[in-house]
Curated annotation (Swiss-Prot):
Coiled-coil stretches: none
GO process terms (BP): Mo-molybdopterin cofactor biosynthetic process
Organism (species): Staphylococcus aureus (strain MRSA252)
Pfam families: FdhD-NarQ
Keywords: Cytoplasm, Molybdenum cofactor biosynthesis
Function according to Swiss-Prot or TrEMBL: Required for formate dehydrogenase (FDH) activity. Acts as a sulfur carrier protein that transfers sulfur from IscS to the molybdenum cofactor prior to its insertion into FDH.
Protein name per its UniProtKB record: Sulfur carrier protein FdhD
Amino acid sequence: MNKDVSLGQPIVRYEDGKLFNTTDQYVTEFPLTIMVNGEEFATVICSPTNLEELVIGFLASEGAILKRDELKSVLIDDSKGFAHVELNKDLGDRFQYSTKRMIASCCGKSREFYFQNDAAVAKTSMSKITLTPQQIINMMTRLQSASHIYQETGGLHNAALSDGLTFFVHRQDIGRHNALDKLYGFCIQRHITVRDKVLIFSGRISSEILIKAAKIGVGVILSKSAPTTLAVTLANDLNITAVGFIRNGGFNIYSHPERIIDSEQ
């Protein structure tokens, strides 16, 4: 069962020279502890929606699973904040950490963890998809118009997957990584191949987000914000087209521009 993503709370507002009582929408932070084969794996701070997708996508992003068939069962106990996962295999030595991990909603993992575990799971894109400039602008416009909770609270990241024409999944979360993990989990649950799909994202394209996109397997990532230098380097290395600053009818292509074609061609 999904809990409320946002809740109305009393506040004091200052406007037009006056203080007055009113209500405002706060986004909900929900700690979810993931247990794998009876052992604590991680605690993720997230929005309390689509939690099974989040758990599956998170485990796949971490390299704990590679496909749906490796999952024996996933039980979400949202009343207690636990996800109980049983796998059809052992986790292996590299997941036997001496300390428990908490993945915060606002940031990624340490650089040491990123290089040791993430690089092995990232995929070089073999995507053949091409997009016109108008398709890019239309997809970003649709993402922003579909994000009604963000418009109410200003506190959620939004992400979607598209074939270039329509969205087939759209997810929101307080954590940018979580929003992408929910997309990933959705695809794994349904055995959806994402090689020729587009990731549309509301946040900045950091190196960690680029790596996450590579893990999911997309060939194009679109954002209304700019990428970092390391993200562009990784995008070039992993054959991913990164497009940013999509606003006011324009955008910048930072890597592999061959997938963006003139609409008149």
